């Protein structure tokens, strides 16, 4: 129950862990660094998968599956890639009771094993573009783990595409990062900034990385999705060439992009409260719980509750009834608040005689009467839409209230725990590294949204807050997960 959850103001990190476990979203595994995703948590992932998969297919992508094990020779073909991932890799050295002739890496990401296949499949410009997505698990050996946010094994999707021209590849990079932005904002009700990573923060082996960044309730940033322009790096490493329309042999241009179960952690930290989980209706596998107040003619009340649930379900709203008698209505109210059910309906004998029920919103706690007539399902649908929009609006207002410009390093240090900081940077990696070492803050992105850039005069020349060197523009700094 909610009384087992540490208040956010007391200990935000403990609040998060308490909530994840109390709401039965995930639990620790006996395997160090790994987690068990429980049914409540996996139901959220299934909703995310369904929405994203539809968006991928609407943009022309298809699903496939590639091996979990990657030969060491594949990994070594792209030097920057292996340098970036080597410390995180799990390596298989024995199989079938014998030492393997070649080590096998447990998939940290699939570029290398996928490009070994693409080399076989791509011969001509007619084979392009190749637009493939994979739903899979990956392993990156983590020393400090946190449920959903950072674990040694996690679930994700990874898109890998091949193109005939650099322009087509760049269009794909931007298309997919905008798909992620749309998903985050329209499904997760979580506003995000969109932009490019600095060279030191980009994906290992990429020419350029684009990302979306969200602000959590503790004012830290969370990277919620990435899209990488891989140039011709992997094509050259795997000698993947195609015959162009002009008859010449050319290397293909590549992208990759992905999101993971980390989004569940983001969803929790963006919206939830001290009573438990708060879910946007579009990602709630159970959107409405009906709690009958079993007094008087209990059977009539229970039957009405089930009839209402049937009506909602037939209208595409996922509803269920809890008419068990071993727990009180008050216990049920608290339990379903903990689980984040967006709407609770209360109905008793007097409500039936008045032809109404009481609807309670999980996000605000507000209650209202709903008429039990032919407008009932439409009223609940409108309420769910209002909750979805209200959650996004609230999160956006929170981010805007905690985003500020700073003009000096002293001010930067004082404000870095207060949200997103907009500040001048001289473009040098050594300056970026110094700021990170001294403040634990990183450049989250170079934002590309025109309205955001205009609001904060991002292109205005100035002086770097740290080095005092000339700066061509501003970037977004924050502490991050």
From Swiss-Prot:
A Gene Ontology term for the protein's cellular component: cytoplasm
EC category: ligase
EC number: 6.1.1.15
Single Gene Ontology MF annotation: proline-tRNA ligase activity
Presence of the UniProt keyword Methyltransferase in the record: no
InterPro entries assigned to the protein according to its UniProt record, in alphabetical order: aa-tRNA-synt_IIb, aa-tRNA-synth_II, aa-tRNA-synth_II/BPL/LPL, Anticodon-bd, Anticodon-bd_dom_sf, Pro-tRNA-ligase_IIa, Pro-tRNA-ligase_IIa_arc-type, Pro-tRNA_ligase_II_C
Catalysed conversion reaction: tRNA(Pro) + L-proline + ATP = L-prolyl-tRNA(Pro) + AMP + diphosphate
GO biological process: prolyl-tRNA aminoacylation
Keyword set includes Protein biosynthesis: yes
Disulfide bridges in this chain: none
Keywords: Aminoacyl-tRNA synthetase, ATP-binding, Cytoplasm, Ligase, Nucleotide-binding, Protein biosynthesis
Source superkingdom: Bacteria
Cellular location(s): Cytoplasm
Similarity comment text for this entry: Belongs to the class-II aminoacyl-tRNA synthetase family. ProS type 3 subfamily.
Record note on quaternary structure: Homodimer.
Domains as described in the record: Consists of three domains: the N-terminal catalytic domain, the anticodon-binding domain and the C-terminal extension.
UniProt xrefs under PANTHER family: BIFUNCTIONAL GLUTAMATE_PROLINE--TRNA LIGASE, PROLYL-TRNA SYNTHETASE
Protein's job: Catalyzes the attachment of proline to tRNA(Pro) in a two-step reaction: proline is first activated by ATP to form Pro-AMP and then transferred to the acceptor end of tRNA(Pro).
Name of this chain's protein: Proline--tRNA ligase
Gene: proS
